[in-house]
Amino acid sequence: MEKIIFTGTFVIALLVTGCTSRMNDGNYPGNPEPLIQNAYIKLPLGSVKPEGWLRDQLEAQAGGLTGHVDDFWPDLVNSSWRGGDGEAWERGPYFLDGLVPLAYLLDDERLKDKVKEWIEPIISSSTDSGWYGPAKNKDRWPLAVANKVLMQYYEVSGDDRALEVIKKYFRYLHETPPDWPDKD
């Protein structure tokens, strides 16, 4: 009987130790002291891999509209976000908001190449002031969506340039008063 109690106690101790050590894992970033821990923690993109039905749905999405809409929709084909002379507002960033997680969750090289076709012009558009994106866009809203995209890209790629663009942009926001309403 003592052996069973000892074994049970040992197993429980291992489980508890394993669970608490997980909270210190990079995939489970908690709030630093003295902040209260959140009940739910957002996991970094890619820390959970889709399988089964979910993977099938994502593969259908990759073979469908998300994986191909930028091949034929003029607003995306010629988007200023990817270096063209077309649409410069929010369509490109919203498209990327779906494409980036899809490409990296599926580990799909074709989609990752598409992501790079968009991300490289965005990263290289960052100015010394911190503003980035198409030159003809003067509205802050599309950059809010683009910041989310850059953060997703940073999480899956580790590309520090994406994080630097976001940091520079937030410095710009701190130093530049709001320009609402848009006068143009």
Question: What spans do the regions from the language model cover?
Answer:
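Sec-dependent signal peptide recognition
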Residues: 2-9
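Glycan-recognition and catalytic cores of secretory/periplasmic carbohydrate-active enzymes
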Residues: 21-184
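C-terminal motif of bacterial Sec signal peptides marking the signal peptidase cleavage site
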Residues: 17-18
